[in-house]
């Protein structure tokens, strides 16, 4: 894929950068793998806002993606690469030799016609899924499980990947894009290569309306609110924050560590912010 800078034919097009999608399938998605997706607009069952800045947006179906890749030893042919509105990565439709079809996260470099396999005996080839114990040290991987059989949870977004650093006993050490080094059970599965659509990070939406299409509502700064609404609010005329940046509920907004899961602390070998002061 490549990117294209749009000509400034209007205010909304000026500065817009898009990802070229010539290689993507232009037809309708595979219907048996679609599910209804209800929009909550950031509200809970009482109608109260639980997540700000959500609402509206285009309706779309959820594409059921196979994160487990548990059809071992059965070759699957890539039928097509598709756009998925639910994630930044593209998805690939696989047709297995027994006739079953499944969606997977499309790895970088995969094209229609490629043949993929999963299982302990699979070759070390981009798109194949194996247990980590069968993957050589130094291999770039993505779609990594955190618990055996649960399905991929790590490195699933566009351009994401991780590197297998070492294997010792029942655990392997994996370095994530954030710099964090984490221990993963060697029976967990991972896919060879990195996620495609790496140019996603270079995209510029060009106008506010593009965010509204995505269901993202405007974000109001705290300094322009009243004191009752935000800790930064109030003052006569334009004033600064007068304190460290915080959320509407007083939680520090810059660099404050919010992780609170001591049960799995021993699985983190090196924290992602270990080089920050």
From Swiss-Prot:
Keywords assigned: Ribonucleoprotein, Ribosomal protein, RNA-binding, rRNA-binding
Coiled-coil region list: none
Biased segments, Polar residues type: 39-49
GO molecular function: RNA binding; rRNA binding; structural constituent of ribosome; transferase activity
Ranges annotated as biased composition (Basic residues): 50-60
Domain of life per record: Bacteria
Region (Disordered): 37-60, 223-264
GO cellular component: cytosolic large ribosomal subunit
A GO biological-process term: cytoplasmic translation
InterPro entries attached to this UniProt entry: NA-bd_OB-fold (IPR012340), Rib_uL2_dom2 (IPR014722), Ribosomal_uL2 (IPR002171), Ribosomal_uL2_bac/org-type (IPR005880), Ribosomal_uL2_C (IPR022669), Ribosomal_uL2_CS (IPR022671), Ribosomal_uL2_dom3 (IPR014726), Ribosomal_uL2_RNA-bd_dom (IPR022666)
Pfam assignment, any one: Ribosomal_L2_C
Keyword Ion transport included in the entry's annotation: no
Biased composition range(s): Basic and acidic residues: 229-244
NCBIfam families documented for this protein: rplB_bact
Family designation: Belongs to the universal ribosomal protein uL2 family.
Quaternary structure and partners: Part of the 50S ribosomal subunit. Forms a bridge to the 30S subunit in the 70S ribosome.
Function per UniProt: One of the primary rRNA binding proteins. Required for association of the 30S and 50S subunits to form the 70S ribosome, for tRNA binding and peptide bond formation. It has been suggested to have peptidyltransferase activity; this is somewhat controversial. Makes several contacts with the 16S rRNA in the 70S ribosome.
Designated name of the protein: Large ribosomal subunit protein uL2
Organism: Neisseria meningitidis serogroup B (strain ATCC BAA-335 / MC58)
Primary gene name: rplB
């Amino acid at each position: 894929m490549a990117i294209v800078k749009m000509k400034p034919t209007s205010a909304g097009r000026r500065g817009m950068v898009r990802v070229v999608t010539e290689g993507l399938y232009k037809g309708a998605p595979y219907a048996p793998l679609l599910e209804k997706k209800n929009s909550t607009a950031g509200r809970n069952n009482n109608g109260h806002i639980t997540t700000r800045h959500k609402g509206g947006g285009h309706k779309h179906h959820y594409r059921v993606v196979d994160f487990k890749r548990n059809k071992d030893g059965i070759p699957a042919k890539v039928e097509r690469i598709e756009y998925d509105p639910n994630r930044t990565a593209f998805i690939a439709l696989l047709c297995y030799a027994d006739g079953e079809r499944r969606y997977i996260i499309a790895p970088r470099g995969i094209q229609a016609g490629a043949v993929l396999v999963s299982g302990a005996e699979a070759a070390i080839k981009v798109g194949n899924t194996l247990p980590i114990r069968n993957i050589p040290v130094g291999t770039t991987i993505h779609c990594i499980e955190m618990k055996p059989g649960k399905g991929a949870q790590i490195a699933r977004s566009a351009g994401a990947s991780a590197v297998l650093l070492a294997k010792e006993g029942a655990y392997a050490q994996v370095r994530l894009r954030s710099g964090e080094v984490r221990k993963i059970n060697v029976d967990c599965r991972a896919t060879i290569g990195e996620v495609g659509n790496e140019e996603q990070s270079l995209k510029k939406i060009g106008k506010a309306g593009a965010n509204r299409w995505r269901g993202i509502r405007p974000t109001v700064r705290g300094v322009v609110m009243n004191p009752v609404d935000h800790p930064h609010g109030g003052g006569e005329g334009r004033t600064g924050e007068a304190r460290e940046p915080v959320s509407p509920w007083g939680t520090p907004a810059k660099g404050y560590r919010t992780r609170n899961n001591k049960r799995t602390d021993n699985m983190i070998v090196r924290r992602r912010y270990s080089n920050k002061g």
